[in-house]
Amino acid sequence: MTSFFSSTIAGVPRIGAHRELKFALEGFWSGTVSGRELGQTATTLTNDYCDQLAAAGLDSIPTAGRSYYDAMLDTTALLGVFPERFQNLDDHPNDGLPAHIDRYFATARGTAELPASAMTKWFDTNYHYLVPELSADTRFILDDTALLTDIHDQLTRGHDVRPVLIGPLTYLSLSRTTDGSDPLDHLETLFEVFERLLAKLPTPWVQLDEPSLVTDVAPEVLERVRAGYARLATRGGVFVNTYFGAGDQALDTLAGLGLGAIGVDLVSDGVTALEAWKGEELLVAGIVDGRNVWRTDLCAALGTLRRLQARGPVAVSTSCSLLHVPYALTAETGLNPEVREWLAFGEEKVREVVALADALAGEINESLFDAAAAALADRRHSVLTAARDADITDADRSRSPFEVRAAAQDEALDLPPLPTTTIGSFPQTREIRSARARYRAGHLTPEQYEDAMRAEIAQVIRAQEDLGLDVLVHGEPERNDMVQYFAELLDGFLTTTNGWVQSYGSRCVRPPILFGTVTRPEPMTVRWFAHAQSLTNRPVKGMLTGPVTILAWSFVRDDQPLAVTADQIALALREEITDLVDAGAKIIQVDEPAIRELLPLRRAEQDAYTRWAVGAFRLSTSTAPDHVQIHTHMCYSEFNELIRSIIDLDADVTTIEAARSDMQVLAALKSSGFHLGVGPGVWDIHSPRVPELAEVSQLLSSALESVDPRRLWVNPDCGLKTRGWEETTASLKVLVAAAEQARTDLLQRASTSA
């Protein structure tokens, strides 16, 4: 029998404490970093992190090997199922990189001729994964050389590592097929493939991540999963881990199979797990929060662990991978000292895991336990977290009927059919980033920085006018991030200097920390909007980030309901919208790209969420008069699940990421009777390629088949912050040309029918 471990974490970050992998990747893609250098960077990061975890005292160390982009994409490579369009792509193996690296990155980023795979959010987080593309004819061909090499390297370095892989159910549940077949048709076959793979792994333990087991899974599928894991269990040392939700379904499905361990997320739902566990396998208790930044209540956690230990073997872990939190609090030197004591980043969470495991074995670190108790008491009684009184009525969340608003807006805006616009941000050039850095370092005065941003806004306005766009944006040069910008201007938030987490690939974000009562001390965007609007006769959109997205993309206080915090943010945005209207804004965009992320994974819990999420958005926007058009933007979402909520938001225009998913959202819009304005994106900005006119025209034609042309907008998928000016200009020329061509066709059809 494989001996049990006592302390571990669910998974590891890959990007590096100082974003080393990000810079190596971007250098490799641009040709300034060699394949050998990229491989060495990934190797160093993997080795150093394993060393740190071992030194911290963990007795089982998770490893995914050298990952260059995403765990789901790693699994696609492992199973040999890159999309068909890339299968004939000639690989050019670089020393130190896997032989499939060209197909790997083509799947993630596309090529000049071929689009990338779809990308969407990982369950209810702000991390993104590459969606596998399968078909009924898919054949899995193990390509495990890189994985086995990486595991062997760590074993020779003396580490007790545990490979972490995406499990069969989760991999297939998150896949899409190109022929309409069911990905789960491959379930039994994939279990057979994993059986062969696990037999080759030289480690006592192997971890298979099955977060899909916390979602709604059909009973017949659970039976097939149970049968599959019964086969894998014979290997010994198989640890099936779940996270992001209650573990009752997983425990019921997997109990009694002879698995070595089952992991559950006690942060999301500890009570259910306590009831469901029968004490037969090692329970890996995810009791340290892996996706938020607050210190653990060590005394309460130890009490829970002791109750579990009375029923069977227990190991201490994080609730999910530490991919979702910053590396270490020690890198932050400028935080509010009081709030700092309330926090724990990745390094500190590992220390908490070890302390709890030691305490469970009878060795209590009294200084750490006392410090945690003192911090929790201070946070509970701090004036920074005091409640804000708000007398909110149903009328505060309501506007006039859409038909009334649409008539007023059509008269106020006088736009052509199929109006063209962008989502908000324009390229953040080296000059913009330099000016911001120099300003923060004190090398530019506020006046000099303001002048630099105003000059950039003027350039963006001129460029849009030259391109022929109908509704303009100011380009957001003053914003380093669409959430952090507002967090720095609202009370109740703090921001970090090195609190980076991976969003996707080389893209990293620094989520702000929402620690207290949210208020708006002064206007945040009005002066930038007013300057932009003064430069043009065309309408310029006021640009705000919505309350749910600010919530979803921040580390949020966990001592009051999310609905209460969302309304606090909404009231601050409501004040900003009132000021924008007073400054002359006729269109105000309130982005909610993250509204899908916080949706509970089980249907029984979703209605309550959508009520308060929709309510917060409407609370922020309902102050706008009828003639002011409210836009919102959404991306990376499974819109079919949210179509009713999108309608309930009651935004006048909703722009949606759609190009990468071949306009799949259109069917949902059509079947729902969606009657509001909509702009399904016709250009995938996440791929570094300029779309062909025929490609954009085809997407626009598809949209016209499902959307009333009087309510259809033409726009890219997302903001243009990460793109260069050359590709942005070229792509927008294509977008405008496609819109003009479609307008001509509409007018011709109208004259013919007349």
Swiss-Prot record:
Q: Name one matching Pfam family.
A: Meth_synt_2
Q: In which pathway does it act?
A: Amino-acid biosynthesis; L-methionine biosynthesis via de novo pathway; L-methionine from L-homocysteine (MetE route): step 1/1
Q: Give me the residues that bind L-homocysteine, please.
A: 423-425, 476, 591
One of the GO BP terms on file: methylation
The prosthetic group or cofactor this protein requires is: Zn(2+)
Task: List residues binding 5-methyltetrahydropteroyltri-L-glutamate.
Answer: 19-22, 121, 507-508, 553, 597
**Signal sequence range:** none
Can the keyword Metal-binding be found in this entry's annotation? yes
Q: Where are the transmembrane segments?
A: none
The EC number(s) this enzyme carries: 2.1.1.14
Cofactor binding notes: Binds 1 zinc ion per subunit.
Which transformation does this protein catalyse, written as a reaction?
5-methyltetrahydropteroyltri-L-glutamate + L-homocysteine = tetrahydropteroyltri-L-glutamate + L-methionine
User: Which residues participate in Zn(2+) binding?
Assistant: 633, 635, 657, 718
Q: Does the keyword Glycosyltransferase apply?
A: no
Q: Recite the UniProt keywords alphabetically.
A: Amino-acid biosynthesis, Metal-binding, Methionine biosynthesis, Methyltransferase, Repeat, Transferase, Zinc
- EC category name: transferase
Q: Which residues bind L-methionine?
A: 423-425, 476, 591
Q: Name one GO molecular function term.
A: zinc ion binding
Q: Which residues act catalytically here?
A: 686 (proton donor)
Please state which protein family the record places this protein in: Belongs to the vitamin-B12 independent methionine synthase family.
What's this protein's function?
Catalyzes the transfer of a methyl group from 5-methyltetrahydrofolate to homocysteine resulting in methionine formation.
Tell me which NCBIfam families the record gives: met_syn_B12ind, PRK05222.1
Q: Which HAMAP family match?
A: Meth_synth
Q: What is this protein called?
A: 5-methyltetrahydropteroyltriglutamate--homocysteine methyltransferase
**Source organism of this protein record:** Corynebacterium efficiens (strain DSM 44549 / YS-314 / AJ 12310 / JCM 11189 / NBRC 100395)
Classification from the root reads: Bacteria, Bacillati, Actinomycetota, Actinomycetes, Mycobacteriales
User: Which gene is annotated as encoding this protein in its UniProt record?
Assistant: metE
